[in-house]
Amino acid sequence: DDPSFDDLYPVGTVAQVRQVLKMPGDAVRVLVVGECRAKVTEVQQTDPYLCARVESIPDAEYVKGTPKVEALVRQAAQLFDEFADLTQRPVQETMLKILASDDPGYIADLMSQSATYGFAEKMRVLEQRHPVRRLEISNKLFAHELEVLRMENQLQDQTQQNIDKGQRDYFLRE
């Protein structure tokens, strides 16, 4: 791909490349660590690659330790725990970080890294400067995603039961 300035989103992540792995078939896997949210302030060059000056977007101020913040943090931990159970993905390290933090913005960002919802939804989280609102958005997205995952599991169980019943009936007829 050869992205232009028009292909960029207004808010993005400044990230540090930690590792580049060449995979079979000319594929490349890159490990990056996000450092901060930022917006492009000036395009410095477009050829041979896009280069821009960015400005960090700090979190908005919020009152720490309020009952609302505590409730959102607890809800996030519960949602993420159920997500880990339903997806059976290796997210133990992320879960430990969520449990160890009381920063709603940090927790929302951690959850979004592991989330299975779409890119547009992840951008909604990224673009929100207010940490409490960011966690509210993240929790709502996770709650919806959990409903979808539960329904997928239920449909998969029903399908498996139908297959098992069909095989049992076939075996008994033989």
Where are these regions (language model features)?
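N-terminal low-complexity, acidic/polar interaction/targeting segments
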Residues: 1-174
